[in-house]
């Protein structure tokens, strides 16, 4: 299986700079970081983010990143894209992440997740939220999905 969870606003691939599953990323750059931390996420030092080549800011404030999620003996690929609006928001909007989840059985489920800008999320938190939504849309074994994405 391929080995990446890609978050991007374009087809840019950042596989040279993998992040760990425990790495927390910012959902939007509209709010200075660090900001509110999700209960399952670990805050990241402000000075550590701008210099990192694996974290690139999109022109409209989204964040592009590559994360690796460990499986038992391999890694599982999921592709995400930021769905953001133009610049000049009068108030911080909600951002949506679209997950294209390639399950181990080769079935595909498309899942949208709405998140608040300025909030820190871990890769595991986002993937678990995607799993819950995907399971409500497409019948599959939860244990099978969990084995593929945990």
UniProtKB/Swiss-Prot annotation:
Query: Outcome of residue 127 to A?
Result: Decreased host caspases activity and apoptosis
Residue ranges of region Apoptotic activity?
Answer: 93-140
Induction (UniProt): Expressed at 72 hpi, barely detectable at 48 hpi.
Mutation effect (residue 135 to A): Decreased host caspases activity and apoptosis
Question: Its GO biological process terms?
Answer: symbiont-mediated perturbation of host apoptosis
- The yes or no answer to whether the keyword Amino-acid biosynthesis is present is no
The alphabetized UniProt keywords are:
Host-virus interaction, Modulation of host cell apoptosis by virus
**At which residues is there a site annotated Important for the disruption of the host mitochondrial membrane potential and the induction of apoptosis?**
127, 135
Q: What else is known?
A: Undergoes active degradation during infection.
Protein function:
Disrupts the host mitochondrial membrane potential and induces apoptosis probably by inducing host CASP8 and CASP9.
Tell me what this protein is called: Non-structural protein
């Amino acid at each position: 299986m391929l080995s990446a969870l890609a978050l991007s606003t374009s087809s840019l691939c950042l596989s040279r700079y993998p992040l760990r599953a425990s790495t927390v990323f910012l959902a939007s750059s509209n709010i200075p970081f660090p900001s509110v931390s999700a209960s399952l996420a670990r805050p990241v030092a402000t000075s550590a983010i701008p210099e990192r080549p694996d974290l690139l800011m999109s022109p409209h404030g989204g964040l592009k990143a590559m994360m690796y999620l460990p499986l038992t003996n391999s890694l599982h690929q999921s592709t995400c894209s930021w769905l953001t609006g133009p610049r000049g928001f009068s108030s911080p909007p909600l951002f949506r992440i679209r997950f294209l989840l390639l399950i181990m059985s080769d079935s595909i489920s498309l899942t949208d997740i709405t998140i608040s800008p300025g909030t820190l999320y871990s890769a595991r938190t986002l993937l678990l939220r995607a799993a819950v939504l995907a399971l409500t849309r497409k019948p599959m074994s939860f244990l099978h999905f969990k084995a593929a994405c945990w």
